[in-house]
């Protein structure tokens, strides 16, 4: 498994809405993530700084990257763009984090 972590932002007035939209996520999005090898996906909110920290274990970079081209992912990004900064393609603005410690 490959462990990934990344940071995103959520609009200051959208914390509750962001959480509501993720509880639960669309069943078809969950199915796509799982079928593309994503496991143990978690998102954490830093309310003071409006930051979202995400962690996920993936089976391969290629399968993970392929999620972005699925119809359901494209629809999800469009659905979320009003509660968080988004790129021109509607994907959330994010930055990958470098793992500096891991205790198994």
Curated annotation (Swiss-Prot):
Keywords recorded for this protein, A-Z: Carbohydrate metabolism, Cytoplasm, Isomerase, Rhamnose metabolism
Membrane-traversing stretches: none
GO CC term, one of those recorded: cytoplasm
Binding site for substrate: 18, 41, 76-77
Pfam families xref list: rhaM
Catalytic activity: alpha-L-rhamnose = beta-L-rhamnose
Keyword Metal-binding: no
Protein location: Cytoplasm
Main location: cytoplasm
Gene Ontology biological-process annotations: rhamnose catabolic process
Subunit structure and binding partners: Homodimer.
Family of this protein: Belongs to the rhamnose mutarotase family.
Name of this protein: L-rhamnose mutarotase
Species assigned in the record: Salmonella heidelberg (strain SL476)
The gene coding this protein: rhaM
């Amino acid at each position: 498994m490959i462990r990934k972590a990344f940071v995103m932002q959520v609009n200051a007035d959208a914390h509750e809405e962001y959480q509501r939209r993720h509880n639960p996520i669309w069943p078809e999005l969950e199915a796509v993530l799982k079928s593309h090898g994503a496991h143990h996906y978690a998102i954490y909110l830093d309310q003071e700084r409006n930051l979202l920290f995400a962690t996920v274990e993936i089976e391969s970079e290629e399968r993970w990257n392929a999620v972005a081209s699925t119809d359901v992912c494209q629809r999800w990004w469009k659905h979320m763009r009003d509660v968080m900064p988004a790129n021109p393609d509607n994907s959330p603005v994010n930055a990958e984090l470098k793992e500096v410690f891991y205790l198994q």
